Design a protein with these regions (language model features):
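ER/Golgi luminal nucleotide-sugar-dependent glycosyltransferases, focusing on the catalytic module
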Residues: 1-263
Length: 263
């Protein structure tokens, strides 16, 4: 994101957050102030802001009933609105729906890993095809782990799981080896500061250990450089489903960068 997005975000009544070493005006909330890991943004993605929020006046930032996150290309929608509606202000979420009343966490609707196109499977899944040519033909065998190995580094998820704490290691291993969908993009909405803090405590302790394995290599290809974001993306789904009363909610892709209709 950049300063060019500022007025658009303000028009949507959202709070703009600038990540990493980009130049942002003073109206932006920054992840490089106070206690932070902003310098890791290229590898951690949006997690550098989640860390900042966790470490700096967490309860103050949770002064409303819910705290939620989205991207400049992905927005929570009103449940009854058609996703293809081009009028963004009429389709995105602006208030807490009644359906959330008895829930603690909102996760985006599931992304199913068996939706990969054949061309991408042939390009990224060579090792899996050599090991088991039928792995992509069955919903049962096309799991989160197979998908991760194909796109983000063969065998790296297994290595990372070994570094998880005893309370989550086997549960997360079972999750990625048996499930065919997860709640992608590291986007969620949370009602409880304690729940948010508990998640961050487990997540960032794990990712810190993973740094000893994967480091901060800028030479990694694009689909692998954000290794800690990709790991947390899968872990987020597992952890909140295990530890919270959650609800799944629709998300729409809408890039505001070149939007001439709404702005």
């Amino acid at each position: 994101m950049s300063n060019s997005h500022l007025e658009k975000i303000k028009k949507l009544n959202y709070i703009p957050v600038g990540l990493g070493n980009g130049e942002f005006d003073k109206e932006w909330v920054r992840d490089n102030t106070l206690e932070n890991i902003s310098y890791k943004n290229s590898w951690y993605g949006e997690n550098t802001f989640y860390y900042w929020l966790w470490k700096n006046n967490l309860n103050k930032n949770f002064d409303k009933e819910w705290v939620g996150f989205c991207h400049y290309r992905r927005f929570w929608t009103q449940n009854s609105v058609e996703k293809k509606n081009e009028i963004l202000l009429k389709s995105i979420l602006q208030k807490v729906p009644n359906e959330w009343k008895n829930h603690e966490v909102v996760l985006r609707e599931d992304f199913f890993v068996n939706s990969s196109k054949l061309s991408k499977i042939l390009k990224h899944g060579k090792k899996q095809l050599l090991k088991n040519p039928f792995v992509f033909l069955s919903k049962r065998t096309m799991t989160i782990k197979v998908h991760y190995d194909m796109y983000h580094g063969y065998g790296e998820l297994d290595k990372a799981i070994e570094l998880l704490d005893d309370q989550n290691r086997e549960g997360f291993r079972n999750f990625v080896n048996t499930q065919g969908s997860f709640n992608a993009n590291n986007i969620f909405i949370c009602k409880s500061p304690k729940l948010y803090a508990d998640y961050c405590d487990v997540l960032f302790k794990w990712l810190k250990k993973c740094e000893e394995l994967f480091g901060f290599d800028r030479a990694r290809e694009y689909s692998r450089i954000r290794v800690y974001a990709f790991l947390s993306e899968r872990f987020l789904s597992y952890w909140f489903k295990k530890n919270s009363n959650y609800i799944v909610w629709p998300l729409k892709f809408h890039d505001i960068s070149n939007d001439k209709i709404n702005f």
